[in-house]
From Swiss-Prot:
PTM-bearing positions, type Phosphothreonine: T382
Gene Ontology biological-process annotations: cellular response to osmotic stress; glycerol biosynthetic process; glycerol-3-phosphate catabolic process; glycerol-3-phosphate metabolic process
Annotated residues for binding of substrate: K144, R296, N297
Record's catalysed reaction(s): sn-glycerol 3-phosphate + NAD(+) = dihydroxyacetone phosphate + NADH + H(+)
Source lineage: Eukaryota, Fungi, Dikarya, Ascomycota, Taphrinomycotina
Keywords: Cytoplasm, NAD, Oxidoreductase, Phosphoprotein
Any Pfam family the entry gives: NAD_Gly3P_dh_C
Official protein name in the record: Glycerol-3-phosphate dehydrogenase [NAD(+)] 1
Classification via InterPro entries: 6-PGluconate_DH-like_C_sf, 6PGD_dom2, G3P_DH_NAD-dep, G3P_DH_NAD-dep_C, G3P_DH_NAD-dep_euk, G3P_DH_NAD-dep_N, NAD(P)-bd_dom_sf
Active-site residue list: K232
Species assigned in the record: Schizosaccharomyces pombe (strain 972 / ATCC 24843)
Binding site for NAD(+): G29, S30, G31, N32, W33, G34, F121, K144, A177, R296, Q325
Main location: cytoplasm
Entry keyword annotation includes Nucleus: no
Amino acid sequence: MSGYGQQGVSAANIDSIRPKKRLSIGVVGSGNWGTAIAKICGENARAHGHHFRSKVRMWVFEEEIEYKGEKRKLTEVFNEAHENVKYLPGIECPPNVIAVPDVREVARRADILVFVVPHQFIERVCDQMVGLIRPGAVGISCIKGVAVSKEGVRLYSEVISEKLGIYCGVLSGANVANEVAREQFCETTIGFNPPNEVDIPREQIAAVFDRPYFSVVSVDDVAGVALGGALKNVVAMAVGFADGLEWGGNTKAAIMRRGLLEMQKFATTFFDSDPRTMVEQSCGIADLVTSCLGGRNNRCAEAFVKTGKSLETLEKELLGGQLLQGAATSKDVHEFLLTKDMVKDFPLFTAVYNISYEDMDPKDLIIVLQPLKEDSENEGGTETE
């Protein structure tokens, strides 16, 4: 499969590559997405035994659960049932995926560390791993979002790299965890462009994740891959507002188009990103469409308009208290744009922030979609069905 610029790399020819050594895979995180990823890693560790050691360790934040009428530790239940009965019930994981309650054990034993924890915990988790990483190890971040501070916008892969002193790539795409776990076909994108001293080829990284139902393409544009997964949540909020107002498909298509352009503009303005990433890869337009057609950000934004309830209330009612990432990201992005004096350059992102936090009437979103006079004064028009 081809990417942009240079050829995208897949795992299709992995068996023709002679590995320098068999690598161990560790998964940091065990929610529904973390467990789905661990399942994939476990399957590939067995399928490519000359590339990977069979055992895949998955760090599980230890907690007690009710299981068959008894109080049991979650790790014990997983290793007995080969199923994450709390976060991904009904999905069997291969027996070579082992749950461990100590993230330090995963850190010590893995050559490839796959990070799938909620973004608000990543720094704390990395702090526990400092000084324990194997020489030559690399990371892959499956965490969607960006870290924003007064210093600027950082990718979570950058946070991991800085904390642990390793190279870290990114995996992102139109990947709903439950659908992936049920082996419904989807595509994903890996951004992996390590320095020369990293001794693990991209094909081997792709082979950690590539399955017949989980099609992987690896490209160089790490920033573009990461930002697609973060910024699409803001656009999904805008489409959710439109759903709440019962606007039609034409209007929602316009929102998605404008949103995609702002995603692309943000990535190329503030990062060294290829503009084609957003339109050619699953991490861009495909993930955007999936989120806009019914993800949690879309649903909560629709309910925000229809019920008049605050986003904080809807987070409790619809998300079990989890943070609504689209709204939070819009706030982070808005504060960053203020420091750059570029708020007006991203009108859709700004509108989502203003509706979410500044009492802007959602109906005024339509104003953002109307072209400025100077943009259209020289355009002709034709009628279409």
